[in-house]
Amino acid sequence: MSFPLIFERSRKGRRGLKLVKAVPKAEDLIPKEHLREVPPRLPEVDELTLVRHYTGLSRRQVGVDTTFYPLGSCTMKYNPKLHEEAARLFADLHPYQDPRTAQGALRLMWELGEYLKALTGMDAITLEPAAGAHGELTGILIIRAYHEDRGEGRTRRVVLVPDSAHGSNPATASMAGYQVREIPSGPEGEVDLEALKRELGPHVAALMLTNPNTLGLFERRILEISRLCKEAGVQLYYDGANLNAIMGWARPGDMGFDVVHLNLHKTFTVPHGGGGPGSGPVGVKAHLAPYLPVPLVERGEEGFYLDFDRPKSIGRVRSFYGNFLALVRAWAYIRTLGLEGLKKAAALAVLNARYLKELLKEKGYRVPYDGPSMHEFVAQPPEGFRALDLAKGLLELGFHPPTVYFPLIVKEALMVEPTETEAKETLEAFAEAMGALLKKPKEWLENAPYSTPVRRLDELRANKHPKLTYFDEG
């Protein structure tokens, strides 16, 4: 049965609320140049229709609150509802308020920054970036400003990335004006040290690494990598996508990283299943601190204030002060668990991943890079099975599928990240489902799912010719 869009439910003249008092005309409140030329085409529905519509939509969704969501490299952990209550309390703040009237909010941001610096081993931090990729770009722009300030901006034009890197890494470097060169992985799934040595030199601006990497493996030679980068004058950039594995146990700053971006919407339980809002703070070592974007939240004798007086700053990277309510949720998470709780969360994330990996191996799946897994691992189905078909089959069995076809160096990759918040019984049920799929007829897998609201989408067409609004005829 098809589910009508809210615009298809619209009937002219229907309304959910009737205003009993005259409302001022928009042109009396808003400058003419900021007014729309034509009124917005909003749906006209009564309140009951509206409630049923969105309640119906909620029942057609899959999320962490409804099922196991092992999306690799996304850390789809449970988001405590207490954090939603905390965020709600700040809803009436306005970014144009005098900072003297928002001391509590500024204190929260300052404290969160201190917590994140302590967890990462960084000396200074900005909370401005609104997402992980936004944080990446901010970090690379800081590195670019640093090299330019030293007179090396014209010579250091290359950024190195591993072949297992997130796609946003090379995209970020390219957006910042750099050439990108790929470093291959060695036979154990870690950075090929000899290949890295051949690429390092006075032409390189930075090396971007994720540790643990996207195969779920810790880069055991990270101190050697860091030493080589330092000798070559290369800045070492930490993609914080996988910090959940080492949170409280190891710090990027102690490994030699100069810049780190974090994903509060992953590691620190800010909801992100619907695409945001996210938060990607960027921490730096002291030599890069002058280039951080403005403003920074600082603590002075008379309280907390916003520091715009930073002459070497790369400038603003976002309006106002970051996605503030995401910061509230992350602050609440850290305050709730404390350091010992964060360490336990990381340990459980690793334990769950290792247990689930062994369960899937027993069911017939292969793990091509089978070292000591951290928070996630990459599996392969037996010959003759496609990762895409297995992912669609999982939807039919009531589970969200893992990430498929990434990292690119693993054929038919199934990237699984169970997170720390899942119970042993859930992992076992998922493994049973994965095993059951291998016993399904090929035709069943190729046509799954069967009972979802939408079956197989034309994903290529959706990417190349998106219809972004109801009124878009494209």
Swiss-Prot record:
One of its GO terms (biological process) is glycine decarboxylation via glycine cleavage system. It comes from the Bacteria. CDD domains: GDC-P. It catalyses: N(6)-[(R)-lipoyl]-L-lysyl-[glycine-cleavage complex H protein] + glycine + H(+) = N(6)-[(R)-S(8)-aminomethyldihydrolipoyl]-L-lysyl-[glycine-cleavage complex H protein] + CO2. InterPro entries: GcvPB, GDC-P_C, GDC_P, PyrdxlP-dep_Trfase, PyrdxlP-dep_Trfase_major, PyrdxlP-dep_Trfase_small. Keywords: Oxidoreductase, Pyridoxal phosphate. The keyword Oxidoreductase applies. GO terms for cellular component: cytosol; glycine cleavage complex. SUPFAM superfamilies: PLP-dependent transferases. It holds the Pfam family GcvP2_C. GO terms for molecular function: glycine binding; glycine dehydrogenase (decarboxylating) activity; pyridoxal phosphate binding. Its EC number is 1.4.4.2. Its cofactor is pyridoxal 5'-phosphate. The modification N6-(pyridoxal phosphate)lysine is found at residue 266. Transmembrane segments: none annotated. The glycine cleavage system is composed of four proteins: P, T, L and H. In this organism, the P 'protein' is a heterodimer of two subunits. The glycine cleavage system catalyzes the degradation of glycine. The P protein binds the alpha-amino group of glycine through its pyridoxal phosphate cofactor; CO(2) is released and the remaining methylamine moiety is then transferred to the lipoamide cofactor of the H protein. Belongs to the GcvP family. C-terminal subunit subfamily. This is Probable glycine dehydrogenase (decarboxylating) subunit 2.
